[in-house]
Amino acid sequence: MDPNQHNPPAGHQIVHVRGDSETDLEALFNAVMNPKNTIVPPSVPMRLRKLPDSFFTPPEPKSHSRQASTDAGTAGTVTPHHVRAHSSPASLQLGAVSPGALTSMGPANAPPQHLRQSSYEIPDDMPLPPGWEMAKTPSGQRYFLNHNDQTTTWQDPRKALLQMNQAAPASPVPVQQQNIMNPASGPLPDGWEQAITSEGEIYYINHKNKTTSWLDPRLDPRFAMNQQRISQSAPVKQGSQLPSSPQSGVMSGNNPIRLQQIHIEKERLRIKQELLRQRPQELALRNQLPTSMEQDGGTQNPVSSPGMGQDARNMTTNSSDPFLNSGTYHSRDESTDSGLSMSSYSVPRTPDDFLNSVDEMETGDTLGPGSMATQPSRFPDYLDAIPGTDVDLGTLEGESMAVEGEELMPSLQEALSSDILNDMESVLAATKIDKENFLTWL
């Protein structure tokens, strides 16, 4: 078979047409337009689908009846229960045991007590409590109906009666032992009352706020502290001072530690204030020199404006920090990516950009003879207004500063090495930069 037979040439398309495509498409439209004419395949009836009987029986409302008690029992309180579990020791419920019986097992001299009546099946001839009725499920499991509150339960109420009857004669012994072993002996606080439930559990009633509690109020540390202070104090009326005295004692004990923490916080705040106070000075020092150079390059006759030195001198004399004073000069914000960054202003080496600008100001084409005469008197005054700059003014000095220049030159010649001098010569011999291209922003 030729393989090229199934591969059409480029640019040609093969359309396959099926014989029943039109009929299938018409059938789809007819099924939507005429739904009555369509034949729906019969489905299996619900009764023949092998579903359980409970699927067809609607749930009955939860009510007090024997029919509804099989499914509508108290599911929240029912524990995993087997059919014959009520006759085994596993049916012992720890919640039904009174706290007095549990506390009686704590002391070593107390005899062990075994609740044997809950480990065997209760005979059927024993009468149920008033208002109770016993019934059986279809599977034969027994449950109990409480007509008093209209509830059903799996637990036999006769077990609680037997446990309460056995715990009743033994209850005075745990109470006496509790009074001996527990320091919470004595009368109850004012407004409290002790009571016992039907299952033998002891609880306490607070008549002041009409609440009940399982906790003995005599075990409350606040009540014990108040009783101790009342017994130790004289009959002086100090009721209003009792609640505040523990807090005052705690504060007096922690007073030196609190003072030390406050002192440390003050030191931290003082250091932060010093750093914030030094930060504007550094930023202004970094940005003032490039900003002034930009102003000199942007004006038509930069050297012939003698007011700049006077303003700078006024800024230094009017306040301790000339850069924090509000004047007519606006400094540029700090730019980390600028080519004119003065981040190395503390280095003794003279910046290259500054030397280029000085050379340009000396040999500019637009400078006249009159403006050259005013330059030595203006430029040093401007540099004097900037604190902390290590700029050599030997090349800019006039006749008035010749004595100071002679004093500085020997020390500079001794400190400079041949490498630094070669770098200075290469910088000075470089091509002059135009004023328009002097400031290059990156």
Curated annotation (Swiss-Prot):
Species classification: Eukaryota, Metazoa, Chordata, Craniata, Vertebrata
Coiled-coil zones: 258-279
Main localization, broad class: cytoplasm
GO BP terms, alphabetized: blood vessel morphogenesis; BMP signaling pathway; brain development; cartilage development; cell adhesion; cilium assembly; determination of heart left/right asymmetry; dorsal/ventral axis specification
Biased composition (Polar residues): 288-304, 313-329, 337-347
Compositional bias of kind Low complexity: 238-249
Localization per Swiss-Prot or TrEMBL: Cytoplasm; Nucleus; Cell junction, Tight junction; Cell membrane
Keyword Transcription regulation tagged: yes
Region (Transactivation domain) residue spans: 247-442
Phosphoserine, modified sites: 21, 69, 87, 119
Sequence similarity: Belongs to the YAP1 family.
Keywords: Activator, Cell junction, Cell membrane, Coiled coil, Cytoplasm, Membrane, Nucleus, Phosphoprotein, Repeat, Repressor, Tight junction, Transcription, Transcription regulation
GO cellular component: bicellular tight junction; cell-cell junction; chromatin; cytoplasm; nucleus; plasma membrane
Presence of the UniProt keyword Metal-binding in the record: no
Outcome of gene disruption: Embryos display a small head with smaller eyes than normal and fewer cartilages in the branchial arches. Marked increase in cell death in brain. Incomplete epiboly at gastrulation, characterized by blastopore closure defects and impaired axis formation.
Organism domain of life: Eukaryota
PTM annotation, UniProt: Phosphorylated by lats1 and lats2; leading to cytoplasmic translocation and inactivation.
Tissue spec: Expressed in the notochord, brain, eyes, branchial arches and pectoral fins.
MF annotations from Gene Ontology: transcription coactivator activity; transcription corepressor activity
PANTHER family xrefs: TRANSCRIPTIONAL COACTIVATOR YAP1, YES-ASSOCIATED PROTEIN YAP1 FAMILY MEMBER
Region feature Disordered, mapped onto this chain: 51-89, 97-116, 230-254, 286-374
Domain WW: 126-159, 186-219
Entry-linked InterPro entries: TEADIR3_omega_loop (IPR053819), WW_dom (IPR001202), WW_dom_sf (IPR036020), YAP1 (IPR051583)
Function: Transcriptional regulator which can act both as a coactivator and a corepressor and is the critical downstream regulatory target in the Hippo signaling pathway that plays a pivotal role in organ size control and tumor suppression by restricting proliferation and promoting apoptosis. Required for expansion of the neural plate and neural plate border zone progenitor pools. Acts as a direct regulator of pax3 expression via interaction with tead1. Plays a key role in tissue tension and 3D tissue shape by regulating cortical actomyosin network formation.
Protein's UniProt name: Transcriptional coactivator YAP1
SUPFAM superfamilies attached to this UniProt entry: WW domain
